[in-house]
Amino acid sequence: MITASNAEVGEVWWRLAYRRVRNIKLPWIPVFIMLLLLVCAGFSPLVAPHDPTAINILDSKLAPGENLNYPLGTDILGRDMLSRLIYGARTTVFISLVALGTGALAGTVIGLVAGFREGWFDAITMRAADAALGFPTILVAMVIVVIMGAGIESIILAVLLTVWARFARMIRGDVLSIKDMDYITAAKIAGVSMPMIIWRHIFPNTVNTLMIITSLQVGQVILLEASLSFLGLGLPVGEPAWGIMVSEGKAVILDVWWLSLFPGVAITVVVLAFNYFGDWMRDALDPKLRRL
């Protein structure tokens, strides 16, 4: 964690972080994979060669390379595999951004307030965080989706309720380590309000931890969404989502092997890229956080 003096707080933390990062070699392969994912997600209609939901029985089960119009082949309904993979990236990025962003916001606010105020709020929220972290993530997500029903809203809520606790725990730890510093005490004596102290003096010193946790959690969120979709607890069947595509191909994997292979490879490569980038962020910004 990078801490700053009273005069530096709020304006220097990002410069210190930048100086640390710029001297470390950027992992270009993971970065390229992440950029490719974002391009596919943001420009799916322009990048995809076909409509991912268009059915063409005459071109069903085309193997990769058998027809140049379908370089990755087609599924049992004649839908283009490449287009479905590209549109699947949009689904993955949308769910990850919304769910992880909401979970990070909730966890950060809870961690900041709990660490600064302590007392009953700290006790209640941290016991709730312990409970959330004590259960397997996939089990909690499955219970939520079963109760609410399959759909994108259920997946987002499931991810939110499984990631907020880690953010809250780590941010609270940062707050406890700096809340008694001289410049914080001086701000309290001067009558500065709690929200202003948190925003101007404490939050800037937690940004590094927030960035590291977020980068490390993206891969887990993608894997969780794919797992729920594979189990039939995610998006509706037929949607171009990677987990659903793997599930649709499992029954014919010996005959039409590419149905499960390509989305499975996409999930694996993207998750590994984000995990590697998260490790790089952790080592670059704060090697002490290697326990994450």
Regions found by a protein language model. Give the residues of each.
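Gly/Trp-centered helix-boundary motif
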Residues: 1-108, 112-113, 120, 138, ...
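Hydrophobic/aromatic positions within or immediately flanking transmembrane alpha-helices
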Residues: 30-31, 139, 155-159, 185, ...
